[in-house]
């Protein structure tokens, strides 16, 4: 049976998804205009899988979020497709820039044990791995 977790207005145009226990962590794009730009970018937030209740992880709009992975320490590594940013979002919502690239940083893979980011550069038609060890001391 299908389960609707939340109404469209609270979802902020979900893009990246990650299940953690009884929660769905959502990387939101923000409400797109006709050209996919946004007046208000999306947040990173958590939806309770039982109640559908939404809890913001980032208190401010974070970006046009795409890729989402756990950092293995209670936080997240996320990509902003439009801005070309790779961000770290700590468990408390603090956000910092890890890497800056050209537009097109899409879904990603992050391997916490080796601190390796595997990132598609969609508009450049390439995939590259990055060592983030220095970013997670």
Model-derived features: positions:
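Short loop/turn segments that connect beta-strands within beta-propeller blades
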Residues: 1, 48-52, 89-94, 132-135
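A short beta-strand motif characteristic of beta-propeller blades
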Residues: 2-9, 52-59, 93-99
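Beta-rich, blade/repeat-based domains predominating
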Residues: 8-31, 38-41, 59-75, 102-115, ...
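Flexible "stalk/tail and boundary" regions
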Residues: 21, 87-93, 112
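A short loop-to-beta-strand structural motif that recurs across blades of beta-propeller domains
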Residues: 43-45, 85-87, 126-128
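Lipid deacylating catalytic domains
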Residues: 46-47, 58
